[in-house]
Amino acid sequence: MNFKYSILFICFVKVLDNCYAADDLTTLRNGTLDRGITPDCTFNEKDIELHVYSRDKRNGIILKKEILKNYDLFQKSQISHQIAILIHGFLSTGNNENFDAMAKALIEIDNFLVISVDWKKGACNAFASTNDVLGYSQAVGNTRHVGKYVADFTKLLVEQYKVPMSNIRLIGHSLGAHTSGFAGKEVQRLKLGKYKEIIGLDPAGPSFLTNKCPNRLCETDAEYVQAIHTSAILGVYYNVGSVDFYVNYGKSQPGCSEPSCSHTKAVKYLTECIKRECCLIGTPWKSYFSTPKPISQCKRDTCVCVGLNAQSYPAKGSFYVPVDKDAPYCHNEGIKL
């Protein structure tokens, strides 16, 4: 997997950046990479599975949107849980190891109902092929369709199970971050309001580097948008949220020798923040050419802790986050906000 990511994003990044999250996949299927060698990553809503985690289903169960009532929680007329909807990225799955760990942290610490959207075929993970990385442009195009699926599922939660939008947050990694943004746009179009929060974990860079708000994750897609940047090669290196955390300057991460490792670290960092064993502190950082404010000078009104409580801090903008190599990754000099 790491080798494939490196090949895709280092060797083909310039080609892929000509693609975009199109409404019409015909453009992408007729693209320069489609010459009979690309996998068929065509999106079909029927292929999507929902991995549902709760305290009585800690290992998760697999459901389809059409058969939710097979799980007793969805036999109720109202769901009162806080809900986290997880959306994976390219070549991944809804129950990948890192998402599974995050889901279990969410149900253990905060009793969330966690729903991980598995769109693996549309993300080109359903194939045992050496050229599946060439399906990236199709996966990019599929993000809008998956976003609409998530929005439609949200409508079901709101209207059938009386879940307020203020109880729903989306957490997306890589392409899943932009998918979350498209879902956020769609629920507003459906006049459902805004999600409480979207957390974009190293939002994908290739094919999104020059995109404006309508075609990527944007700070207007939820009441609060938090972005955690960990790879300048695989992720976007510009602000997309209410707060943008640049971990280790957002370039590469301690202990990582490959871009895919840094890209994935965003998921691991958030999981540790959910566990609340420590606070990864973001200190104001205006630009790459400026010096971040020292952590020792941090106060609650100027700095922000990464994670589910970030919205409780008043500061917004760009933040530098120092981290250690090993979990729980704290490098906060004993400062508490």
Swiss-Prot record:
Gene3D superfamilies: alpha/beta hydrolase (3.40.50.1820). It is found in: Secreted. SUPFAM superfamilies: alpha/beta-Hydrolases (SSF53474). Disulfide bonds join 41-124, 213-218, 256-261, 278-305, 279-330, 298-303. Residues 22-35 form a propeptide. The keyword Protein biosynthesis does not apply. InterPro entries: AB_hydrolase_fold (IPR029058), Allerg_PlipaseA1 (IPR002334), Lipase (IPR013818), Lipase_N (IPR033906), TAG_lipase (IPR000734). Transmembrane segments: none annotated. Its EC number is 3.1.1.32. Expressed by the venom gland. It is an enzyme of class 3 (hydrolase). Residues 1-21 form the signal peptide. One of its GO terms (molecular function) is phospholipase A1 activity. The keyword Lipid metabolism applies. Belongs to the AB hydrolase superfamily. Lipase family. Catalyzes the hydrolysis of phosphatidylcholine with phospholipase A1 activity. May act as an allergen and induce hemolytic activity. PANTHER family: LIPASE, LIPASE DOMAIN-CONTAINING PROTEIN-RELATED. This is Phospholipase A1 1.
